[in-house]
């Protein structure tokens, strides 16, 4: 394979045996594609599909006035350019959004016209562009910047619209009878439920309201009793014979039934005796006897149901749905021959598989007409309102048959039709979709029929947790729904005003108020449950957050109501949702992560890729299947053995079919997994040897990787999985080349690339400039910084990584550090998962992290006057002001400690009334110190660091202070310098290209050159750019290209002028601050944190612990070569946790390090390049796994590769396709180590050998964002609760340590009376006692004088509130 610029610098040895069938898809596509589909900003208005904003506008417009005389039509929408870019929005605390304008057409019609829809009826047309508010834009990395913070909209997994059949599992009724139900769930609108009760009557509910008999709904649809019976039942004709009634012999209806009477042939032979079951043999006998009818006794007809009215001489003898009894049969037999009833029909029902449920329900129904049914429904939906037939009809129609109120959606219609076995053809036609989005009478009847079929034992209920019944609602769809809500509010207001549009001569601008739309959008992005503050700890946490799928949120589940089933792993999760990565705690199973290869289809269902298998042969065709499409397929595992021509070689292949793991012959296999890692998510896919870890620990491992803090120097994992590169690339933290070329210029903050000729656009200078992000604060206060990994003159290609971001090393994710560890107990310092650390780790800054804090000082208008930011602060010494400038703001670079002033601020304070003399003195001497108080911004307690940046924002109209002007000037100078440099680079590039074009060309004149002169590069060296552009070559094509370059440079100059003017306008203009705010100063503090006891660390296998002690290097255990161990872990942490992956990682890490040391030795001894190639070939190509084509690398490449492998050869052991034990041992041997991976260690303090050999190796350890500095604090005195007067709790409130009732019991048990008294009084809520104690300490008297605790007063007040008087009496 061809390696990219960064990949060939350090090749990861892969142990994968299986070929790569498809690359991992772009990891953020679920976010980016969804929002792109919503906005469609890059498509021309006419080419836009009916989705997202387009669909929202189309569904609301046209809006017609009540009279029909005016109409508002939607033409198109377009998005402007955002006022500030992403970086400026974060600094200013504003939203990254673009203004949206909509072209609206107002049509006024002639009031007197008969046909309002004809062209002749149109009186006036007014078209106008209307501002519809700001629409937040998504950044390239799938995030939104809302009020200056990066947020992510998490996708929601909700129940798909459609029809669902279920039962109550026998829990509803005391008898334990299983009651079936059906539910029609629309995308938008009223829910319709049908359910059985214990008596087998069918009921309906609308929107979970009071129950109605299902027959009421059927009658409301306009069906009569006989029509309902015809729809739901088969009929049996009953003929009146000479002696007995007879029925037709229908074999299928008799099979399996118990004979209620003797069935006799015409000859008198008994074929079936009474009480015997009628089987297939007896039916055959009846048919052979030539019988078409069976004689039945009268008793057989008792309790049977009439299928239709019996009418004799226009008189109704019996109504349809009447139960036949003896009386009715006598009445029927009594008629004379002329008027006799020769036949009538009954319903075919039985107790086995043909229940009379609908007939029984009809009999219980008191309504007899459509009108009565509608009024019944109205009473349930609008209790207390007087019903009329018109309003009832209108309500029922609007609930299920009106597209404005009810939307089953395209997905809902597809699910509905599929479930009921009806045809569904997907279409983009908006009119057909709208037509299909409402229910029809047939739909409701079909649902009831299916429910009754299930109750009759035919058909199955649905599995609600099947991923075919749950779909993903991504950011675009949720934004569209919210936008539509806003538009509906606008529609209501517009309809009111439209009627007066003509008389008041209104324009579309006057009619439409965009505030409801803007408010709806703002609410969704700002405060929706699914709009979350982005987890920006490291690149992995960003990617995982964007790929998260939540079952919570609006329209979803709640934590309290969600049961075990919905949280559990379902077999349809395979390849779609990760079975490992989910939070521990109340959200377990409700918040999931997408599997590595999963994507959503057009209906919102999750799909996973499979290779097509035809006749036992695996093809290269890749099919994405949703959980619905997967039903009935037979899927082989990715590691199933395959021959060279692609045939499955095993006689019986291990497959998945209908959610079960079974073995089948190759001919039956239809699909095959694309990769063993398609089951897991990105985070779980980063755990090496995951297959050897217990699932619970793997869950912790994948969650804790997201909490790793980016270290000062990123260090790639020696033992990885090969997924690291994909995460780093797709997370967006690295700088990736947009086009190939040569690195022209590079410094710490910028990379300049001269683009390849082939990738250039005609006429451009062919330069790409990449500006790097330097020392920026993330959402979690970690440091975002990009470092270049290319050098001047390097050749790069499209997609190469030019700069590493936080936690990336040469384009690979690097969350922690490779640390030399030993598994052994050490003096109890690694008891209970504690971690013993060597001082060497601290010295080398291995786990040193930089945290950036943003501290804000706001100067407001108060009632007493304006707050002022100044260096003139009352009662503050010179030393405290030493780091401030004349404007009262700290210098950049100042090192500050807890309590130091960062921004000086004074606030006016209300004073007592001054005497006239004092007023006079104040007027003369201008003494202000007395009327202001110090409210300066200080460094918080337990913090210290370096000021790395200051930003000053001043309200528009308020004069800027000296510091604000200085910042503005430096930013403008820096920007001007950048632009000048940019232009210089472009001009130089243009010079180079002109030189190449003119070299060897004949000229016809220009620039003082004679016609016919042949140009040479040497002659052009000293010519200015203007001179070069004046040259007129003979060849026309060259002349045209010169003209293009000249035009491009002119455009570039104009572009740079415009950019500078725009930047200057933005910087010099005042800032749009909140009401009452005059000035905001933001100070950024960089805090360097070394690892220390109390910090939490973890490996990738859920092996977490807290640093217990940092030992001197000389006391740590060491091996026979004198190499000390960096970390000592407790071996007892492994067996019970069953995460053996960490031991295998340790061994493989040791081999990787040993091989690196061997390479280092070869480089130091200046071994021949041939020997180096041979050794690398042994590592990469002779231990198994993926082969590396070292011959394709030049000698320089090999040297660069070897240089990068000195610290260890990185290994890639992919999930479920990783290194085998034998391969690990072979590598240990190749590195010159024992195959068992153990070493003899010596005690650093005594020099004595430990009794047994110890497992020593390299493990990748992470420092988690649970730092002791953020958690630990101490309180002397501080704030108290207002009511109880007890100290507050928590670091944020500077609170105290709680002394609870159990601790009180402990003191009681010890009889420590004085300590107990102190705890319950002066150290808690005895207000007077603690004041006296303070006085005593000041006076030097060491005694305590306790009083009455305030909580006792609270108790007495509570008792008094119950009406019981309680008084305290002092007795001496």
Curated annotation (Swiss-Prot):
Q: What class of enzyme is it?
A: transferase
Q: Which UniProt keywords apply?
A: DNA-directed RNA polymerase, Nucleotidyltransferase, Transcription, Transferase
Look up the EC number in the record and give it. Answer: 2.7.7.6
GO function term, MF aspect, one: ribonucleoside binding
> Which Gene3D superfamilies does the record match to this protein?
2.40.50.100, 2.40.50.150, 3.90.1100.10, DNA-directed RNA polymerase, beta subunit, external 1 domain, DNA-directed RNA polymerase, subunit 2, domain 6, RNA polymerase alpha subunit dimerisation domain, RNA polymerase Rpb2, domain 2
Catalytic reaction(s) noted: RNA(n) + a ribonucleoside 5'-triphosphate = RNA(n+1) + diphosphate
Q: Which PROSITE patterns match?
A: RNA_POL_BETA
Biological process according to GO? DNA-templated transcription
A cellular component term (GO) from this record? DNA-directed RNA polymerase complex
**Oligomer status and interactors:** The RNAP catalytic core consists of 2 alpha, 1 beta, 1 beta' and 1 omega subunit. When a sigma factor is associated with the core the holoenzyme is formed, which can initiate transcription.
**PANTHER family associated with the record:** DNA-DIRECTED RNA POLYMERASE I SUBUNIT 2
| Functional description taken from the UniProt entry | DNA-dependent RNA polymerase catalyzes the transcription of DNA into RNA using the four ribonucleoside triphosphates as substrates.
Fetch the NCBIfam families from UniProt.
Answer: PRK00405.1, rpoB
Regarding protein family, the annotation reads: Belongs to the RNA polymerase beta chain family.
What this protein is called in its record is DNA-directed RNA polymerase subunit beta
Question: What is the native source organism of this protein?
Answer: Psychrobacter arcticus (strain DSM 17307 / VKM B-2377 / 273-4)
What are the leading ranks of the lineage?
Bacteria, Pseudomonadati, Pseudomonadota, Gammaproteobacteria, Moraxellales
